[in-house]
Amino acid sequence: GDRLMAEVIKVVGKNVYVQVFESTRGLKVGAEAEFTGHMLEVTLGPGMLSKNYDGLQNDLDKMEGVFLKRGQYTYPLDKEKKWLFKPIVKAGDEVEPSAWLGEVEENHQPLKIMVPFQLQGTYKVKSIVEEGEYTIEDTVAVLTDAEGNDIPVNMIQKWPVKKAMTNYKEKPRPYKLLETGVRV
C-alpha cells in the first residue's frame, strides 16, 4: 500500500492516534503503522530559497500534474548541484552548535553552513575543505568531540518542526514587516 506521512498525536496502549497529512481514503481502523523514529522535520540547506514547496517540503516543480499523488514525496534539496563553499573557520578552531563553518551564496544571499544544531558542547575543527564547489552531501568539515570521536558535517541539517531552536547567541526582534504581496 501507499506510505502516508503522519504525525503521532497520542498513544493509548497499543493504539496510536495520528494526524495524516493527505487523503486517508482506504485506511481502516487497526491498519498497521510504521514508525520512522523521527519527528516531522524540515530539511535545511542550500537550494531551499529557490524551491516551491508544499506543506511537507515536497519540491512541487519535480511533481507531475495539478494534484499531488497520494504517498508521493520528493527530496526537498538538489543533491547534485554544486555550491561554491567558502570556509570561515580553520582546522584547530573550537566551535559550538550553530557556529558558522563556512558559507555559500544562493540568489546573491549568503547562507551560513553551521555546526549541527542538535550537537551539544564544544568541538574542535579537525578539518575543513578549501574554497571550492561541493554538493550538499559532500563532507565540508570534520569535527572532533571531547571523547575524540569524529563527526563529519555536510551542508544539510534536519530539524523537527515543533522543536524550538535554542542555539543562538541573540534572537533579534523583527523591526520591519516583510511584505510579500502573497495572501496567506
Feature map (PLM): residue ranges:
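Well-ordered beta-strand positions in beta-sheet-rich domains
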Residues: 3-5, 112, 122, 139
